[in-house]
């Protein structure tokens, strides 16, 4: 900031010396007046820059400024704390200052796309004192890289540890409540079954309704406990083995056939005869059971469920879509959240009046199963049918080579 003031004074002094030395007929006073008129503007620029520096320094989010060669030019207070940076001038390569390959890749993507890029990862800061062997605590972060002028990149890094801690506390609380509810619900169900055996006619109808609600609550408790286990990540999985996705989808279809048959729903599969992933067979079955069951509940009578399986590199991609009404745009960001129920107009009247509506946990469980298997799941509306479209991506089982005979894609009722 003082550089502007210094340059202005230097320019003024130079003009006076030049005029005195050469006794130039050029009128120096108008030139000096023009230079002096810049002073208020330069002072305002200086003030704005100081405010900008103060704002960046006190931001609760970590900020880094990189030049065109990925040298770190600036780091605010939050960045120095989060990244364990020494209080010194930087002007060193990013990977030397912040040893995070995820951050380096984020910046590279930003430069390649010339557009803001966002990513999440677990950051492990490097201890600035090489004599201290105490490891730094890994922290979940979210980073955003923003392209600026002259090849510079602005990087914002948010520490998500508090959010993760709150989510873990919530999950522990839900798990504890579910455990506490499991035993009394079992007792109520057993008592209701014993009471039903002793009653006849109209009172038995009320007991049957009581049993139905008890079973629904019991399933809700089981789903909550399942979610808590799956949120542990891969450690929440049980036996890992080679699982054939095609055989798994066939089993799911057979299990849900009694639900689809009254609606005369077709099933159109296109893909190889086998496709192996490494995973927990029981959890993967639950994944597809939830997705196909959800599709059946929202499909019109006489409609069709479409399943397409293909391989891309070392990943299996499975698309499941229908020709129903599709997702509401307002629902798309929240479909995989716990207890979220979408637009009721999507549900068929018969399904909407069912005595055993969904718990709102089916898609949340599906997402956790996919993420526990290091995969990805996404939802949108299909561009051709207009129906709901769910895409699941899972890593291929590396030890098995799938058959590549492609199905005909024919419909079967």
Swiss-Prot record:
Residue numbers bearing the Phosphohistidine modification: 179
Listed SUPFAM superfamilies: ATPase domain of HSP90 chaperone/DNA topoisomerase II/histidine kinase, Homodimeric domain of signal transducing histidine kinase
Domain of life: Bacteria
Residues of the Histidine kinase domain: 176-398
Record GO cellular component, one term: plasma membrane
One example of a Gene Ontology biological process annotation: cellular response to phosphate starvation
Recorded catalytic activity of this chain's protein: ATP + protein L-histidine = ADP + protein N-phospho-L-histidine
Class of the enzyme per the UniProt entry, highest EC level: transferase
Purpose of the protein: Member of the two-component regulatory system SphR/SphS. Sensory kinase. Is involved in inducible production of alkaline phosphatase in response to phosphate limitation as it is directly involved in the regulation of phoA transcription in response to phosphate limitation. SphS functions as a protein kinase that phosphorylates SphR.
Protein name in UniProt: Sensor protein SphS
Biological source species: Synechococcus elongatus (strain ATCC 33912 / PCC 7942 / FACHB-805) (Anacystis nidulans R2)
Chain's gene name: sphS
